[in-house]
Structures are given as structure tokens and as C-alpha cells.
UniProtKB/Swiss-Prot annotation, chain A:
Ligand for members of the frizzled family of seven transmembrane receptors. Probable developmental protein. May be a signaling molecule which affects the development of discrete regions of tissues. Is likely to signal over only few cell diameters. Involved in the correct positioning of the developing nerve ring and in axon guidance of SIA and SIB neurons, probably by binding to tyrosine kinase receptor cam-1. In addition, regulates the positioning of some head neuronal cells, muscle arms associated with the nerve ring and the excretory pore. A lipid is attached at S219 (O-palmitoleoyl serine). This is Protein Wnt-2. It is found in: Secreted, Extracellular space, Extracellular matrix. GO terms for molecular function: cytokine activity; frizzled binding; receptor ligand activity. Pfam families: wnt. Glycans are attached at N90, N352. One of its GO terms (cellular component) is extracellular space. Palmitoleoylation is required for efficient binding to frizzled receptors. Depalmitoleoylation leads to Wnt signaling pathway inhibition.
Curated annotation (Swiss-Prot), chain B:
Coiled coil: none annotated. InterPro entries: LPLAT_7/PORCN-like (IPR049941), MBOAT_fam (IPR004299). It catalyses: [Wnt protein]-L-serine + (9Z)-hexadecenoyl-CoA = [Wnt protein]-O-(9Z)-hexadecenoyl-L-serine + CoA. One of its GO terms (biological process) is Wnt signaling pathway. Keywords: Acyltransferase, Developmental protein, Membrane, Segmentation polarity protein, Transferase, Transmembrane, Transmembrane helix, Wnt signaling pathway. This is Protein-serine O-palmitoleoyltransferase porcupine. Its EC number is 2.3.1.250. Disruption phenotype: Embryonic lethal with severely defective embryonic morphogenesis with no endoderm and excess mesoderm. In addition, embryos have defective mitotic spindle orientation in the 8-cell stage ABar blastomere. It is an enzyme of class 2 (transferase). GO terms for cellular component: endoplasmic reticulum; endoplasmic reticulum membrane; membrane.
Amino acid sequence: MIPRRSCWLILLLNLLNVQSLLDASWWSTVAQLSTALAGHNVKPVCELPGLSPGQAQVCELFKDHMPAVSIGAQNAIQECQRQFTGHRWNCSTHYSTGMLGPIHKMATREAAFTYAILSAGVTHEIGRRCKQGLLTSCGCSDETKPKNVPTDWSWGGCGDNVEYGYKFSRDFIDIREKEHDPKRNHDNGRSLMNRRNNEAGRKILKRHRKPKCKCHGVSGACNMKTCWMQLPSMEQVGKILRNKYDKAIRVQINDRGNLQLLADEATKERKTRALPTDLVFMDDSPDYCRFDRHSGTLGTEGRVCKRGSGGAEGCDSLCCGRGYNTYTQEVKSKCNCKFEWCCKVVCQTCNNVTQVDICK
Amino acid sequence: MDNGHGYEEFELLEDGSLGECSTQVANATFLTISKLICLVVAFKFIKHIPISTTVRVYVHVFASTFTVMWFSRNHLQSAIIYNMFSLISLALAIKQFSGYIILAGNISLLIALQNFCRHYRSEDYFLSIRGILMIHIMRLTTVAFNLEKANSNKFRFVQFSSYVEYIYFPPFIIFGPYLSFEQFFKMRDKKWTGSENELGFIIQSLLAIFNAITLAIISSCHFEFFEPSSQFMEDALTAMSFRFSHYFVCLSTQAFVLMLGSDVVVANPLNIEFSRSTLQTVSEWNKPFHTFLHENIFKRRLFNSTACNVFFTFAVSSLLHGLDFQMTITLLALGFIAYSETVFRKRLSARYSMCVAAKACPVRSNSLSCKHRHSNKTGRALIINLFFLMLSMYHLVFTGMTFTDDYSAIGYPFDHAWKIWGSHYYSSFMISFLFLALSKII
């Protein structure tokens, strides 16, 4: 537990760095769109500070899409946290800023995973709502393209709903990486990496569509099948991306300004070409043990761990050798419920004492 | 500097653009039904063309063989298997073997084929051809029982050709329906009744086909229209999906028999969805199937005991599916549920003189109501019948929710049904045991 006096210092320091935090936490803005929608009971607010000018423009043009983007982002964050439960980096929110979603200042594997799964989440949700007919510009719209929409943008037509979600996600998310935002530095490498990982997330969703079939026939036989393509669930996407995360590829920027593979130091094997669905990163990951303002890590202090477990959630690993404190926790629950004639159920209140191990 | 310029573009591996579920299912079902409609139209004209009996027999045999090949994945294999069943059964029938022996032989052959497919990891192939073989065995058994009555001295080629034509009738091979011998020849010998009547039949058929395809779309794509909010709703949708797939088959075949000039009823979905009792559900599920079991198995009374004959009927019904534990246990469950409900309602009807039996009361010609004191119109009987209507709907969910999509093409595991029924705490069985107990008390 951080002493109370440090909270003010941290808050003050965070205010000084709010400019750089905004860049890394724009997903938090996207995830808040539905909150703004619910709170004000009006159309989503497109002036949130985390959106880039291009994204704000798309937001105005496709206001009915923004709740889907928001829910897709939230689903992705949930799945991310589920995949990394018990790990030092667990996709958690920076508690002092009150923002939603992880923050990545460095171009690490974790940043790659986060961008990929968020992109996949938005694609998934847009595609799903397309199918349900909840988005106006999905399906066979005869509306002509407005003039202020750039010419190379995809305009919703009669395409497959997954295709539409894919294109919208690409346009809305990647536009940020292509803009010259005065708020941020011109980090070409990071921008290319983000675009690459965004694309990987979207491609994984498209490639893992599977046909689902139903049998028809005499008395439960299967004389005939009717089949249709089905999207993978976010759980499946999370699992696939987790695999990609474990096998992420290190890249750097070459002289021509392109991403270039680095030799894998472990195997000394040089990959000639990365798959389109591979995740890429440029920086080594920190150990995520200590709170570090510069690298944007939260640390594992105060995390619940499992004593005696050898996995990532074990106290030895999660607490980084600092040890843990054991606390007793009283949980009240109803027990020994009996039916009394007539006519009610009477329960006793039991106090269950459990032990919780928390990292020092 | 343009940041996008340096981005290395990877080639998009575009999957083929796919329509949505409803579009794909509509296209697939219409394509299959179109092929069958071609057969129906062709044989509607063939039956009116004056050709010799010998030529007609050959036309039927070859067309049927090609139909089996056309609709199966393994063409030659399916044709050989189909004709093997025919040749063995006809040979045994001509040699005056009993219909029961031929039925048992066919079922043994079916189970042997199933084990063969299982051995070579081709269970999906067996399931794809099982429906065809089931109806085939039913027709062969019907011929066998008919031949039992025939006098061997008067057996002629004309009679034999009738049997062959009955067995090898291409429009009814894939989805059925099963027609009894009398029904088939009544249909075949029906004269051309004029363009007006034929147009009426065609319109009825097209309406049935439209309904069939609609139900197939709902069966496959119900998730597009409705997302379940609870586990019970999901189970109900699974059961509905299974039933609507069945209705698709029944209404399609209903259209075929209408086009060919028969008035045989295959199934009425409304009578099943809003059934008076589970007994009615069981008999209405597939009327031709019910006719076969009732006339060829139950009414022949192989055993003296009615209970034994009922059990034997269910056993045959189950074994016509091969060794399918899921189907066996579902049929037994339906039999048990229907039996207990019938017993209870019969007792209830007699004890309180109410018109609440499993079967509707027969209305006598000399009065407007039945013999019971509380007829259908009284409030008390109406409420009780409404309760049993709702219960029948629940039984439909209970017995149908085990037919999930994940194993339907390869066969269900042994404990699949029990696990799913366990999630409902075996409620239909509990209700049935309760009914049996109550019928002893009141």
C-alpha cells in the first residue's frame, strides 16, 4: 500500500505528464464513448480529448457506430484481462488516473497484444451489429458518399458484414497512426508497429471464420447440410493472440523507414518474412515488478497471489521475490437454509474465514 | 514526411465474399429441393406415358440408382449399398421368407454397415446415407409382408414389377416420404384430372415448399433473429431448431406427394407445436412413419401382450436408425412420457368424468358433446387441457434440446443426452413418475 502522502505526489506528477498519457490512453477515450452516451442520454460526444482529429471526423460521420466501437473495445479489454489473469502484467487500468484500459509507453510485446486485441474487438462488434441490422450504413445502402470523406476510404456497401467491420476498424483505428498530430512526437517506428499489430488482430478474426453447419434429414439423419460462416468468439481470438504474443517478433526501423525483422537472439535464426498475423514489437519488456512512472508500469505490489503455486500467479513469481503478507478475510454467506412451515425459508449466517496472500 | 508511405503493405488474403446465414441457407435448400422437384416432374410425366412394363421397371431402377449417387458423397459406394439391400431382401421375399426375418436381416445389415463405417472412421458417411436406407428398409419390409399374402403359384412378372416400381421410386428416395403399398398405387394409378386441378395442387406444393425453406432458414439461422437470454431459452431454441429441420423435410416431401397427386399427409407442424398430448406429438411427428410402424409392426401382434407389442414397436423404430444410443434413449423417453401421461389422464378422465384424456373424446352423432359430464367446453376441463398443452410444449423442449449441432453430423456421444437432461434435473421423467404415482392414488 502506497502511503497517502505519495498519492498527491503521484497525482501531481501525472498532471505534468498528462500530455504524453493522452497519446497512450486514447483507447480509454474510445471505451468511454458509451459511458458518455449513457450519462448524457444523447448522441456520443465526439470531442473527447483522446480522439485524433481524423477520428473525431469519423466519429461525427458514423455516430451510430460509436457505441459498437466502445463495446468492442470494452470486450477486448475484458478478454485481455482474462488472458493475463495472475500475470505481472495483467492488462489492468492505471488506478490513479481513473482511465479505462492499459497504457503502453514503450513498444513492448504487451503493447502489441493490446493493440491487436482492441482492433479485433472493434471489428468483431461492428461485424456483429452489421449482421443484426443495427448500423445504418451497413448492408445495401444506396446513399452516396459524402464529399468530405477522403477518396481512399471504404464506404459501406453490400459487402459481407465481417468485411465491413474489417474496413471500418481499419479506417477508424489506423487513421490515428497516419496523422501528424501536434500533440505527439513523430515516432514513425511506433506508428508502423501499431498499424501492423492492428492489422494482425483484424486478420486473425477474418482468417479464423469457420463454417458452421446444420444437418437435415429423415429422422435425425444428415442427408443434407446447410452451412454458413461464423466469426470466432472473443475468447477464441484472445487465445489465438495469446499464442501470437508468446511468439512475437522483434523488429526495428531500417534506413528506408520500413519495419525490418531482427535476428532472434535465442535461436540465432533469422526469419526471412513474418506472417501477416504475427505480432511485432521493438522494445524489451520491463519486468513489471515495480511502479515506474517513466515506463508506465504499475508494479505488482498489492496483487493477490497464490501461495505455493509454481505458475505465473504464484507468490514467488508474481511478487518478484519481495515476499507477501497473509491476511485473514471473513466472508459472510447464507448457510443451513431450511424451509419453515408455512411458508418461508430461514437461513443462518456463516462466517467463513479464508486467507489471502498479497504481494509486499 | 508522410508516415504512411513507409508502411509495408501485406497482401490481403481475401476470403470469398460470403452472404449472410439466411441467404446461404436459402440458396442451399432451394438447390437441393430443385433437384428433387425435377425428379418429381419427370416421374409425374413418366407415369402418364404409355410405356411397357419392362421398360418402366428399368427406368425406375436406373433412375433410382442415379438419384442415390447424385445426392450422396461417395457415389458408387452408395449405389452398391442401396442395391445390395434391395437384392437381398427381394431374393429372401421371393423364397417366402417371413417379413420379420427380412426386417431383421435388413436391420442387421444396417448395423453391420454402421460398424464398418465406424471402423473406418466414416461415421459421417453413415449418417449421410442412413436416412435413405431407413426409408428403403421400410419399403422393402412392406413388400415382404405383402408377398407373404401372395400366392406363389400366381406370382407373375407384372406383380414383381409393381414391387420394384414401389421400391425404386426416385422422388421419394432421399427424403421420403414412406408410402404404404396401397397409398403408392393409388397415387400411381391416379388419372390426369385436368389443368385446373393440377394447378391447384401445384400452388399447394409451392406454398409447402416456401414454408419448408422458411423453416429451414429459421432452423439454421435462428441466432440471427433472436439471441437467447438464458440457458433455458438456449435449450428451447436448440429444440426448436431440431423440430424445424424436421418440418423442413416433412413439408418438402408433402409438396412432392401433392405434385404427384396423392393426398397423404406427412406432418402438420401446428399439430406438433400445439399438441394436445405427448401421445399426439409422437403420432403426428411423422405420419407415414407412424403408419408403417402401426400397420406392419404393431397391428401384426407378434406378441400376445400389448405392452410387449408397444415395446417391440419402439425397438423397431429405434433400430431403423442403426445403433444410435441418442435416438434410442430419446424414443424410449418419448414412449415413457407418452405412456405415463396417457395412463394418468385416462384415470383423471374416468375419476372426475372430464374430457381430459390423451386422445380427444369422440363426439357421438346424436349429441353435441361426449359422454363425460365435463365436456371440452367447461372451464375446468379447458384449464386442465391447457395445462397439458403447455406440458407437451415443455416435453418438446426436453426431448429435442439434446440434438445439438456439434455432433449431429458424426453421431452423439454415449452420455450426451444424460448430461443435457441432467441440467434440467430430468424434469420430464420426474413429471412422468409423478403421473404414474398419482394415477394409483386417485
